[in-house]
Amino acid sequence: LATTATAVVNIDDERIAPVIEELTCRLITFGSSKAAMLKHGPVKNHGLEGSSFPINWHDTQANVKLQLPGIHLVDNAMAAIAVQLAMGIELKDAVKTLNEAHAKGRMLVRHGKNGVVLIDDTYNASPASVAGALNLLKELKGRRIALLGEMAELGTRSATEHQRIGTLSARSCDLLYLVGEQCQLIFEEAKKDGHMNVFWFGTKELALKKLLEELRPGDIVLLKGSRSQELESLIPELERKI
């Protein structure tokens, strides 16, 4: 980066340390570490209602109240605030914007008439975001269902990452529906981990059909996949049925 640039860095990420030492530009660090310029305190997890945590920027304090669920979104929120600070926006204004934030296809919660809860996280899927969504699902009460599409563009890491998600999903949900060639690895790993209620389909339409046949009042349903899977096309049908 040029000396006139600004780098916004998660100081809690050990992989970043060597990079920080080489930077000659303006630096804004964020995280839970005492060394962070923008620091967050203890995070309270409110399940489907989101999360909250205090933050400190120099001598200024504020409280973040994310409406989007998932502890994995805390780092994203901190990065978003840090970027706004880098642009000269006041902390209180940056936090206000974030506290009101919603994004289509990103951890959006919908409540159906029969008590079914739909978590629409269809916009995209990386190993970290899928793991975060599954960890949220694991914490919720009720029968937990996940319909997952494959994670694209992972290169040589693809097999390993899909297998890792297979292990995690087996421990996070009661019913698992999978779509996409790479999801065979999730299927096999989930089965190996003892998960019997896992199904792998050639098309997302078939996966949705099976899911709807099994759906009961009070179920919690997570949809997540890469952009190439276009799982958002299933949302209207699901909304009509719940």
Name what the model sees in each region.
Residues 8, 54, 145:
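Short, conserved beta-strand segments within well-ordered enzyme catalytic domains
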Residues 11-61, 101-106, 110:
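Extended acidic/charged loop-beta regions that coordinate divalent cations
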Residues 1-22, 152-153, 157-159, 163:
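Flexible active-site lid/hinge loop adjacent to a nucleotide/diphosphate
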Residues 66:
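Histidine-centered acyl-transfer/condensation active-site motif
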Residues 23-26, 48, 59-60, 69-72, ...:
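ATP-dependent carboxylate-amine ligase
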